[in-house]
Amino acid sequence: MDVVVFGAGSLGSLIGGLLAREHVVTLVGREDHVHAVQEDGLRITGEIQAVVRPRASKTVSGAADLAIVTVKAHDTPAAVEALSACDCDAVLSLQNGMGNEERLAALDTEILAGTGTYGAIQDEPGSVRCTGLGEVVLGPPDGGRSALADRVGDAFKAAGIETTVASDMPKRRWEKLAINAGINATTALSRVPNGALSDGPLSDVARRAARETARVARDHGVDLPDEAAIAALESVVDATADNESSMYRDVQSGRRTEVEAINGYVADSDVETPVNETLAALLRGWERESKLGE
């Protein structure tokens, strides 16, 4: 399979690198990373050890069987513009937050939704560290089965990536949103690793945010019980106790966060969500004062 990874940062480089063991992969990313991969290949360290030689470029062109989008949610419009120059048979979103698949639909090709739980950190150009093994779950964003999803799933499995092709992606997307709503903003604002949410006052904040997200999911017609959302949250907190969330790292580095696609998405619903409203307001205020807006 000919694959383009748009947004070759941490997760994009890891997934793209793993796929490159079996497929023709082009990583599209920043100049320093692209140059390093072109010169010396991509080095994968940590839980997975490998050196692979995918193609690397700063721009998108030509054709591909699949484009994988791994950019931040607020960069999805830029991804749509860039990928319009590529004749892609399908696009898979492996992004945080909601609304990405709807924006990518402007490309007028088949869209798949996905989640990735592999831990990844890009320490330096040309290298990515796998900090935790996980899986990729993918399927049609509105649920059901599709031959495309099965084909992409088989391609991922052939490259040694733990993969599930799911028919219940709406529920899985909302469950992931509940996890992110509980973990990301709470850890970013309190400057703590994920494990700090296992008990105490921060645990209560995270659980309430996840519970509110489940309530909004049900308002959208998705059967996500409060208990399921909280159980998923607790499972991720336990499994990633030593990790810093992506939003925490964004705040540490003075970068714009994905709050609009996570807590902001929940808070902007017609359901009362006081915890998510507060978390979103705090992060929006920080971004505004830091001049990190649109």
Label each residue range with its predicted role.
Residues V3, V24-V25, V91, I111, ...:
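Hydrophobic anchor at the start of a short beta-strand
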Residues I111-G114, T163-S167, V275:
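General beta-strand structural signal in soluble alpha/beta enzymes
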Residues C86, R103-L107, G126-K176, A185-E227:
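Internal alpha-helical scaffold of NAD(P)-dependent oxidoreductase catalytic cores
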Residues H33-Q38, N100-E102, S146-A147:
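Short, charged/polar "capping" segments at the starts of alpha-helices
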Residues E31, T45-R129:
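Rossmann-like NAD(P)(H) cofactor-binding subdomain of soluble oxidoreductases
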Residues M1-R53:
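NAD(P)+-binding Rossmann beta1-loop-alpha1 motif at the extreme N-terminus of oxidoreductases
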Residues R207-E294:
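NAD(P)-dependent Rossmann-like dehydrogenase/reductase catalytic/cofactor-binding core
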